[in-house]
Amino acid sequence: LQRVQVRMAKWDGSPHWTYETVVLGEDEHGLWLGSGVGTLFERPGASYRQARPRLHLVTDDWCLPSFQAPGTPYAVYVDVCTPPDLEGGELHAFDLDLDVVRGPSGRTWVDDEDEFAAHRVEQGYPPLVVEAATAACARVLGAVRAGEPPYDGTTTTAPWMERLAQLVGSSDSAARAADSSGR
């Protein structure tokens, strides 16, 4: 079982979310990672244990998409970030605040535009980073709304969710116990 520790940071270098994943495999969309029920997500001042399985897709784009199992507030959650750097069992990227989100009803929106506006000034995002982040956000928003793969519901993600269950198992009772975190 190959594990990858995800270590996100803010542009100023301060730590953001960290969590452990397992490598599921690769396809035309990129490298698929998974985190099972009970995975600990931590950042300064906050932590929770994941209530449902989640997939993470590593590409060379300015984003880190995640795909949630049913029963969560988000079906798709895409962090706009610098292109992820995966080396030696660790993935590093700078979170650039913007998130493209699709809820279980299909409603899709951009979250944290206010944070992006504030942090681009406070943390001094270079113009090329601002341009790349806003372009990635627009591109991903269009793809999620259009249902383009890999944002096509379970068509692309179902085999990877099955692979995750094979590798780390899945437990409805563990999911119910973790539900108290609300994630």
Task: Say what each PLM segment does.
Residues 1-49:
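Charge-rich, low-complexity N-terminal segments
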Residues 8, 25, 35, 67-68, ...:
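Hydrophobic side chains in beta-strands
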Residues 30-31, 63, 76, 108:
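Hydrophobic residues embedded in beta-strands of well-ordered beta-sheets
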Residues 36-37, 42-85, 97:
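Aromatic- and glycine-enriched beta-alpha-beta binding-site module
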Residues 71-123:
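Conserved, surface-exposed functional patches that form binding/active-site neighborhoods
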Residues 79-81, 85, 90-92, 131-136, ...:
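A long amphipathic alpha-helix within ATP-dependent nucleotide-binding catalytic cores
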Residues 115-139:
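Short, surface-exposed, low-complexity cationic segments
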Residues 135-183:
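Cysteine/selenocysteine-centered motifs that mediate thiol-based redox chemistry or coordinate metal-sulfur cofactors
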